[in-house]
Amino acid sequence: MKNADLQARKNAATPRGVGVMCDFYAARAENAELWDVEGRRFIDFAAGIAVLNTGHRHPKIVKAISDQLNSFTHTAYQIVPYASYVELAEKINDRAPGDFPKKTAFFTTGAEAVENAIKIARAATGRPGVIAFSGGFHGRTMMGMALTGKVAPYKLNFGPFPGDVFHAPYPNALHGVTTADSIKAIEMLFKADIDPKRVAAIIFEPVQGEGGFNPAPAEFVRALRKICNEHGILLIADEVQTGFARTGKLFAMQHYDVLADLITMAKSLAGGMPLSGVVGRADVMDAAAPGGLGGTYAGNPLAVASAHAVLEIIDEEKLCERATQLGDVLKAKLTSLQADVPQIADVRGPGAMIAVEFLKPGSGEPDAEFTKRVQMRALERGLLLLVCGVYSNVVRFLFPLTITQPVFDEALAILEEVLKETVGVPA
């Protein structure tokens, strides 16, 4: 089987709207390494878009799924429940930030988690409005797209979107947006667009994912909490990409001294299996009537079994600490290259949720072309990187936190060579 043959078949059989970054096809993977159908090896710094904090095919996860497979694969939790769902909810309730009573519901995708968080918030408050932020990404469903603060490629030609959704700028110091600017914009929304007493929720990412790995400043999160408290609005932290040790904490909200009312989760929750969830204040979570939440595959037993294993791995292998350690090494490497690579304008992110932003020297304009060249040259050398950002000028690093030190060092050496080569500096 050849990559070229599969590519031709893919083009004939699947729509162009499903954009695919690579022109090779996976055959097998192990931890942070992946091999294509022709035997070529790649170091995976994409991890299925932040899904594999515990790596490809971790033995504990493989065993957990296999054991569950030998018992049953599906009952639909709303029809015939199972203990593992309840036990996982108990674990999430115990570990999520906040000492108040909590409840958790499970779904299948990150977009589903966001949709259900909005449903819960509207049910709890009796209000319709939602405020989101520019650069935010919340999924590809209609409500997810309405909340998302980036047009191309996610929202092109798909409207109209659900109403009563409003956007404010997200703080971004590099591009001149301060916390004060963001809060002032929310206050203006209250004057010009929607009465705050009609707003059910404010939803934000503690670190924006697709928007460029922009961390929310602590003063911004405090200000959001203050606004919510003043107006009876619920605060939703979308942790689909930040959760489960990526930022050096189990939840990114643990970096802040205020709490969200609801937290969405998905991606690395189940180590490659489709599982998402919403955890939040028990009284808020109970606002939806029986039958109002759920889904045919929501909380699938195979995915739930995998999630139990993920939590064990994070604890046993100290992945929160490992995330901080690896992230510090990567940030130091990228910072050391700024003298040789003047396009490096910013290196940022907590734990191992690291990104580098490229701007054109002199003009300070976003350099998407340079960013794409870095990504493609890295791919040619066997290193998978993802691009993000409103201007597509940011490379984000999403390596498995279980990556071995030799493979991590090899990847950083490739990255250094590629950056220097792209800018024209001898490696």
Please give the residue ranges for each predicted region:
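Conserved N-terminal phosphate-binding loop of PLP-dependent enzymes in the Aspartate aminotransferase
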Residues: 1-427
